[in-house]
Amino acid sequence: MEKMLLKSTTRHVRIFTAEVVDKELQFHPNKLTLDLDPDNEFIWNEDSLKKINQKFKELINERAGRDLDDYELRKIGSEVEGLIKFLLQNGELSYNPDCRVMNYSMGLPKTNELL
């Protein structure tokens, strides 16, 4: 049976059973590629990126030895999405005012006037 690329897509997280070769995704049964915030809705700093990548690696390691089907990929994507919301709510991440569309998909930003 031929293997095909699996993917999980949320608003801010895309995960593929693939690796990037010459700027193209190529199926790989033992590798996952994370595409984070493809619409550039957030302003990322090194610390928040580090936390996301660390969480992604932890989630993958927890599933070591198991088949990574689309259900497992969705669970990983949902947990990473939850961490993004946590970082945003704690002020470790902010919305990008230059984003194509400002829809505050994870809630209105917290400001001193709203606190």
UniProtKB/Swiss-Prot annotation:
Highest taxon above the source species: Bacteria
Q: Note the InterPro entries from the entry.
A: NdhM (IPR018922)
Q: Which organism is it from?
A: Prochlorococcus marinus (strain MIT 9215)
Predominant location of this chain? membrane
Q: What does this protein do?
A: NDH-1 shuttles electrons from an unknown electron donor, via FMN and iron-sulfur (Fe-S) centers, to quinones in the respiratory and/or the photosynthetic chain. The immediate electron acceptor for the enzyme in this species is believed to be plastoquinone. Couples the redox reaction to proton translocation, and thus conserves the redox energy in a proton gradient. Cyanobacterial NDH-1 also plays a role in inorganic carbon-concentration.
A GO cellular component term found in this entry reads: plasma membrane-derived thylakoid membrane
- Please state where this protein is localized: Cellular thylakoid membrane
Q: What class of enzyme is it?
A: translocase
Q: Which family does it belong to?
A: Belongs to the complex I NdhM subunit family.
Is Thylakoid among this UniProt entry's keywords? Answer: yes
- What is the reaction catalyzed? a plastoquinone + NADH + (n+1) H(+)(in) = a plastoquinol + NAD(+) + n H(+)(out); a plastoquinone + NADPH + (n+1) H(+)(in) = a plastoquinol + NADP(+) + n H(+)(out)
* Pfam families cross-referenced by the UniProt entry: NdhM
The molecule here is called: NAD(P)H-quinone oxidoreductase subunit M
Q: Which UniProt keywords apply?
A: Membrane, NAD, NADP, Plastoquinone, Quinone, Thylakoid, Translocase, Transport
List the GO molecular function terms: oxidoreductase activity, acting on NAD(P)H, quinone or similar compound as acceptor; quinone binding
Q: How does it sit in the membrane?
A: Peripheral membrane protein
> Could you tell me the EC number(s) of this protein?
7.1.1.-
Quaternary structure, per UniProt, is: NDH-1 can be composed of about 15 different subunits; different subcomplexes with different compositions have been identified which probably have different functions.
